[in-house]
């Protein structure tokens, strides 16, 4: 009886282990993929809707999982700091610029940090200019 249970357990372990391996997700052929010198990989896909607008997502493979116990909240803090100015957009310059072209802070310009990713999104950006 013990041998039968051991064999059944080994069989089930093998079945569950093989079931967890998923094939890679196919890439949409309409997506253009490129790599910058700094290591950033980008994906571009044309969408007809919404007409005259574009949406941008910057996804980074960093999140709270990379924090030590004495760093809790650091990933989320750094996400917020990205809206507090850069060399070319000091202070709230990036927010002011986006609002000047019709992008609303909070609704169209936002970000989030999760366990394993930090994502910045800029939606409804007019592309006429």
Q: Where does each model-flagged region fall?
A:
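Hydrophobic h-region of N-terminal signal peptides that target proteins for export
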Residues: 10-18
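His/Glu-rich zincin catalytic helix
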Residues: 5-7, 19-96, 121-124
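N-terminal targeting leader peptides, primarily classical Sec-type signal peptides for secretion
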Residues: 4-5, 13
């Amino acid at each position: 009886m013990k041998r039968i249970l051991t064999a059944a357990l080994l069989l089930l372990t093998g079945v569950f282990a093989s079931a967890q391996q998923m094939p890679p997700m196919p890439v949409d052929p309409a997506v253009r993929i490129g790599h910058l010198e700094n290591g950033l990989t980008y994906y571009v896909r044309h969408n007809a809707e919404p007409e005259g607008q574009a949406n941008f997502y910057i996804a980074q493979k960093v999140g709270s999982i990379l924090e030590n116990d004495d760093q809790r909240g650091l990933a989320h803090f750094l996400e917020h700091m990205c809206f507090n100015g850069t060399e070319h957009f000091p202070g709230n310059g990036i927010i002011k610029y986006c609002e000047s072209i019709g992008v609303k802070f909070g609704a169209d310009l936002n970000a989030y940090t999760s366990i394993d990713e930090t994502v910045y999104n800029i939606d409804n950006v007019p592309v006429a200019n």
